[in-house]
Amino acid sequence: MSSARTPLPTLNERDTEQPTLGHLDSKPSSKSNMLRGRNSATSADEQPHIGNYRLLKTIGKGNFAKVKLARHILTGKEVAVKIIDKTQLNSSSLQKLFREVRIMKVLNHPNIVKLFEVIETEKTLYLVMEYASGGEVFDYLVAHGRMKEKEARAKFRQIVSAVQYCHQKFIVHRDLKAENLLLDADMNIKIADFGFSNEFTFGNKLDTFCGSPPYAAPELFQGKKYDGPEVDVWSLGVILYTLVSGSLPFDGQNLKELRERVLRGKYRIPFYMSTDCENLLKKFLILNPSKRGTLEQIMKDRWMNVGHEDDELKPYVEPLPDYKDPRRTELMVSMGYTREEIQDSLVGQRYNEVMATYLLLGYKSSELEGDTITLKPRPSADLTNSSAPSPSHKVQRSVSANPKQRRSSDQAVPAIPTSNSYSKKTQSNNAENKRPEEETGRKASSTAKVPASPLPGLDRKKTTPTPSTNSVLSTSTNRSRNSPLLDRASLGQASIQNGKDSTAPQRVPVASPSAHNISSSSGAPDRTNFPRGVSSRSTFHAGQLRQVRDQQNLPFGVTPASPSGHSQGRRGASGSIFSKFTSKFVRRNLNEPESKDRVETLRPHVVGGGGTDKEKEEFREAKPRSLRFTWSMKTTSSMEPNEMMREIRKVLDANSCQSELHERYMLLCVHGTPGHENFVQWEMEVCKLPRLSLNGVRFKRISGTSMAFKNIASKIANELKL
């Protein structure tokens, strides 16, 4: 395989040719069998192993996919492993999946989730990506409400830098929205979900109409062809408005109403929005796509650079890869790798275990860990090959230089195609902007070798616990590619005067009904007009089976019967007109009842269980983890951890919540009725706050809608007497 990265071939949007593994072919690694053969049988440890990874827990699931939190055995680094069942996908979906993987391999930006390794067998594809412990921007807004402009600017500079980087590589994302913006442990942005991304060439129009309706450009609603970048620019305008106002500029009770508002291009300007921010919005939200600003122009905008006058935002320059770091090379040699195979894997960009190990060694998982690395010798081939199914094909591996690499698992679990990611942290130089972030099982991630983020610092508020999903799973192919959305006829051909910006925003004291507030930052929400599993949030795709014209007048969240019976994984109580596959696997399909086993195992307060006397003693002597996470004064205390756990259990019981003790100071909690919109699962953990003589309660959502989680989490937090 050539050491140079080959350009991605342009794909016909409507091509449905069955992809062969030749699309991603590469020379088999000498380690391939080892990766697939190492499993739980090879270790005395009861936790399952995949290759060089120990699977810790499921952090996301969907109809055809699971995402697992895993630990790289050789370096101790945590990774996210997405397991995709290819047998559930048709040829068109497979083609899009492989295109997504190829595109992610060429992206190396500190604010884009990094794909680290790809393993392919005959039936399953495993993607190993960064693990974003901070959850989605969507969840952050639900928990905290709108951002102050300083904080929004910090996030938005990172978003624009990453999207402009994609555009300069002639890649368009096409599904930018708050749900696809992740936060790492330091609250830096990571753009995820390249399932609808594609290459573009100016002059050759794209004609696939996809995206999430509130973020979709007007030309998509009109069924017009487009170059590519201009649809991302419109979506960025919606994102900016959402960050600053906590609401959407365009919304409606059904798709028809939403479409009409987008095509009018009118939105309200809240009284608290600065004039500079309002002027910047006018460069994004222009009905005529040819008149929208380019991201290079937007980088020079006044609002974008307030507080950064000496550091104007500029296009990101990708650093040269570092394939000859003597420290990492020597460490790998001590593990049993040879210098030749290390160089071959890196230069050939193979995305194999060798490259993954090298890249993982380049990063420390947490500032709290420092640079200490616990290294283990490489498993012998004899040990790991005994039960290895030989994969008939392998995915090409080509990695950019400095990502935190992680490997994927080869366990036969259902999976959904998507290129999701998990976030590597970019460096923030402004100490006053640091804040405790929510940490879901992994400590704050930090990057040693990755170039610093385009943003020197992030301002952050200390408020209520952030509902973090920890796994942002995107769904590229699994977004119902077979479920219709906007077809040109059904959307109609409303005419818009070209060359005329009809936005004419009006200032009003509060957001208008068309701009539904996501949440307020105080107290439990009284409204649920920013739900996750409804059509207004769902990503749509041309060529889906259901006809929009039959649904345009239905309220969001009401789904007509599917003529094909092809409803894949709805996230809301009753699903949505568009398959909610881009939202993420973390949201379980609430139409399907929770498995009996799952509910029955969540008995209240199961402590300790069986085990040896030694294990029980270790359990009793365990101490809370020292973590950085989003906390508030209501959930911190100088009480002893055991007293805090008793208080938490008391409040959970009072609110009819089931709980199960997973670790000494961590409870898995469930509230609501399986199969209903109020059903939610989350973790509550008593943690020690670093550098403070206080303990705090960490909340982390596992599944369920953002609003359902916020309702119960806020109620419990308010009732805790800590």
From Swiss-Prot:
Changing residue 208 to E: Phosphomimetic mutant that leads to activation but not in presence of GSK3-beta. Residues 53-304 form the Protein kinase domain. It holds the Pfam family UBA. Its cofactor is Mg(2+). Residues 673-722 form the KA1 domain. The keyword Cytoplasm applies. PROSITE patterns: KA1, PROTEIN_KINASE_ATP, PROTEIN_KINASE_DOM, PROTEIN_KINASE_ST, UBA. SUPFAM superfamilies: KA1-like, Protein kinase-like (PK-like). Residues 27-45, 417-431, 464-483, 492-505 have a biased composition (Polar residues). Residues 323-362 form the UBA domain. GO terms for biological process: axon development; establishment of cell polarity; establishment or maintenance of cell polarity regulating cell shape; establishment or maintenance of epithelial cell apical/basal polarity; intracellular signal transduction; microtubule cytoskeleton organization; neuron migration; peptidyl-serine phosphorylation. Inhibited by hymenialdisine. Activated by phosphorylation on Thr-208 by STK11/LKB1 and TAOK1. Inhibited by phosphorylation at Ser-212 or Thr-539. Inhibited by PAK5; inhibition is independent of the kinase activity of PAK5. Keywords: ATP-binding, Cell membrane, Cell projection, Cytoplasm, Cytoskeleton, Developmental protein, Differentiation, Kinase, Lipid-binding, Magnesium, Membrane, Metal-binding, Nucleotide-binding, Phosphoprotein, Serine/threonine-protein kinase, Transferase, Wnt signaling pathway. The modification Phosphoserine is found at residues 40, 91-93, 212, 274, 408-409, 453, 483, 490, 512, 514, 535, 562, 656. The modification Phosphothreonine is found at residues 58, 208, 275, 294, 464, 539. The active site is at residue 175. The KA1 domain mediates binding to phospholipids and targeting to membranes. The UBA domain does not seem to bind ubiquitin and ubiquitin-like and might play a role in regulating the enzyme conformation and localization. Activation of the kinase activity following phosphorylation at Thr-208 is accompanied by a conformational change that alters the orientation of the UBA domain with respect to the catalytic domain. Belongs to the protein kinase superfamily. CAMK Ser/Thr protein kinase family. SNF1 subfamily. Serine/threonine-protein kinase. Involved in cell polarity and microtubule dynamics regulation. Phosphorylates CRTC2/TORC2, DCX, HDAC7, KIF13B, MAP2, MAP4 and RAB11FIP2. Phosphorylates the microtubule-associated protein MAPT/TAU. Plays a key role in cell polarity by phosphorylating the microtubule-associated proteins MAP2, MAP4 and MAPT/TAU at KXGS motifs, causing detachment from microtubules, and their disassembly. Regulates epithelial cell polarity by phosphorylating RAB11FIP2. This is Serine/threonine-protein kinase MARK2.
